[in-house]
C-alpha cells in the first residue's frame, strides 16, 4: 500500500508522508520457536534479589488508571492513595509513577498526589476512540495541560491508521 500526497502534506514534527518505511513490519510468527522459547524462559530460576528489584521497578513504572463514566473525585482520591502507598502494610513498597484520569479530574488528582512524587497523567484526543476532528483533539490536550497534567496519554484513530490514512492520524 502506498500513500500519495503532495509535498505540502507534512506532519507536525517534520514527518513527511508516506510513513510506511518508518512503520515497523511484523513478519510471520514461528509458533513452534515461540513456544520453545517460552518454555525455556519458564524454567529459568531468578534470584530473590533480582526478583525484588524487578518488582520494585515495575511498581515505580506503573500508572494506576480510572477511566470510567462513573469516576468521581472520591474515586480519584482512593486511586491516589493507592498509588502513593500501594501496600499500606509494607511502607517499603515504592510509589507508582502516576495516576491517569480524565481531564476534568486532573485538579482533584493533583491535589491528592501533591508532594508525593506521583505524577498525574490524563487521557486526551477523544479517548477511547480517537475519532474526533483534530481541533477537538487539540482542545482536549490543551484542557488537560491547563488543568495541570504532567503527562498526556493520547489515542489515535485506529480505523484511519489501519486503513492507511496516516495523515489523518
Which residues make up each language-model segment?
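Charged, compositionally biased N-terminal leader segments and the immediate start
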Residues: 2-62
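Alpha/beta enzyme core
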Residues: 49-57, 70-94, 104-169
Amino acid at each position: 500500500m502506498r500513500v500519495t500526497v503532495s509535498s505540502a502534506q507534512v506532519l507536525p514534527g517534520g514527518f513527511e508522508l508516506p510513513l510506511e518505511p518508518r512503520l515497523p513490519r511484523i513478519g510471520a510468527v514461528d509458533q513452534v520457536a515461540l513456544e520453545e522459547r517460552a518454555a525455556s524462559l519458564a524454567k529459568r530460576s531468578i534470584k530473590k534479589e533480582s526478583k525484588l528489584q524487578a518488582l520494585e521497578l515495575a511498581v515505580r513504572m506503573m500508572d494506576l488508571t480510572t477511566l470510567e463514566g462513573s469516576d468521581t473525585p472520591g474515586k480519584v482520591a482512593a486511586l491516589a492513595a493507592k498509588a502513593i502507598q500501594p501496600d499500606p502494610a509494607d511502607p517499603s513498597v515504592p510509589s507508582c509513577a502516576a495516576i491517569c484520569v480524565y481531564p476534568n479530574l486532573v485538579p482533584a488528582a493533583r491535589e491528592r498526589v501533591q508532594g508525593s512524587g506521583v505524577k498525574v497523567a490524563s487521557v486526551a484526543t477523544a479517548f477511547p476512540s480517537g475519532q474526533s476532528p483534530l481541533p477537538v483533539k487539540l482542545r482536549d490536550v490543551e484542557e488537560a495541560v491547563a488543568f495541570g497534567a504532567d503527562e498526556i496519554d493520547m489515542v489515535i484513530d485506529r480505523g484511519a491508521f489501519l486503513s492507511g490514512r496516516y495523515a489523518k492520524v
